[in-house]
Swiss-Prot record:
The active site is at 102 (phosphoserine intermediate). Activated by phosphorylation. This is Phosphoglucosamine mutase. HAMAP family: GlmM_B. The gene is glmM. It comes from the Bacteria. PANTHER family: PHOSPHOGLUCOMUTASE (ALPHA-D-GLUCOSE-1,6-BISPHOSPHATE-DEPENDENT), PHOSPHOHEXOSE MUTASE. The keyword Cell membrane does not apply. Its EC number is 5.4.2.10.
Amino acid sequence: MGKYFGTDGFRGEANVTLTVDHAFKVGRFLGWYYGKNHEDGKAKIVIGKDTRRSSYMFEYSLVAGLTASGANAYLLHVTTTPSVSYVARTEDFDCGIMISASHNPFYDNGIKLINAAGEKMKEDVIAEIEKYLDGELGEIPYATRENIGCTVDYTAGRNRYMGYLMSLAIYSFKGIRVGLDASNGSAWTLAKAVFDALGAKTYVINAAPDGTNINANCGSTHIEGLQDLVRREHLDVGFAFDGDADRCLCVDEKGEVITGDHILYIYGCYMKDRDKLVGNKVVTTVMSNFGLYKAFDAVGIEYEKTKVGDKYVYECMSENGYRIGGEQSGHIIFSKYATTGDGIITALKMMEVMLAKKKTLSELAAPLVIYPQVLKNIRVTDKTQAQDDADVKAAVEAVANALGTDGRILVRESGTEPVVRVMVEAGSTEECEKYVDQVIDVIKSKGYAV
C-alpha cells in the first residue's frame, strides 16, 4: 500500500483525507499518462459514482483534471463499481474510475482505479500517481483549444451492463418473491430493474438516496431491515448490497443471514456437482469461518486461503484459473463473469442454484455450520514486535493445541492501524472469549498495549 492508495483505492473523509485537489490531480495524471498512447493525445476514460453528496463534487474535479489533460471523460453517473469494471474491459477505454467509499459512512469517499482489463489498477501506475500527488514528477502540460477533452453522458454503458446481467440468468424468476436492500447506494439504479425484467416479484427497501443516507443502518452491513422484510412479507429470498454494490449478503426464506462463506459453499458445491469447479478449489481468505473448511472437507472440495482483501482473492484466482472465490463479508468473485466482486451477479447466481436444485436457500446452506467467533482488537506500540514476541507466540500455540480440530485461532496485524487482531472460532462463544482473552492478557503483560 502507498501513502494515498490502499488495496481498495484512495479512501478517507471527503475534503479532509481525500480532497477535490487530490481528485483533480488524479484526473490530470490519468489524462496525460494514457493520452501518450494515442496519436491525438486523447485518452478515453469512463467514470461512475455512488450516491454520496461528495461523489458529485469529486466527479466534477476528476472530469476537470481529465479534460484539462486532453482526455475524454465518459460519465455513467450513479452506478456500481462492477459496472465500471465491465464497461472498461468490454469497450476501448484506457481505464475506469469509480467514486465510492463502498460500505463506509456518507462523509467518507474514495477513488477506485480500474485498468482496461477491468481489474484493479496495477501498482506501478499507482506509484506514479502518488509521485505526481507529492509533486515529484513536475508539471503536466495543459491541453488547449481543440485539444481540451470532451465530457460525454454515457448512461448507455450502464444500460449495456444491465443487459449483460440479464443475459446471465438461465431461468425465469417468475413467481419468486425477492427482497432487495439497495443500501441507498449504487444498487438502486440497477438491481430492481434487473430482477423485475427477469420476472421476480420484487420488494425493495433503502432505494431513496439523499446524499447522506448511504449505508445508514441498511445494506449488507446492517441486514436486520432486510431480515424483517423477508419475514413480514413471507418472501422467498432477500439480497442486501453495500454502497457500491460489489458486495452481497443474502437472507433465506426464514429470515436468517446467509454470509459470504455460505455463498462460497453453496456455489462451490453447485459447480462441483457439474464438474465445473476448476482445480476442485474455492478461494477464501484467512477470515473465512472454520466451519466453512469443515463443510468443504466433508464434500471433498479443496481451498486456497489468501490475505484479507478481494484484491488477493482475485490475484489467486487469475493466476490459477479458479472460478469462485471471495470473502465472508460478501465480496464474491465469479471469474467467468466478472473481474471484481459483483453483488448483483452474486444474487443472480444464488437464484440460479435455488432454481436448478429446486431447494430453498436455507436447505442449500444447511450443511454448513458456522462456528461462534470472537474477534478483539488491541492497540499496541509496535504491532509487528507484539505479534512476533516469543511469549505471545507460545500463548497462541497453546490455544491452537487446546482447540485441536474443533476450532482455530488467528492473530494478525491491522493493515491501517496500530492494532493487533485476535480471533478465535470454537464450539461456544464462551470458549472463544476465554481463549482470546488469554492471548490479549499476554500481550498486555509484555507491555505492548497502549
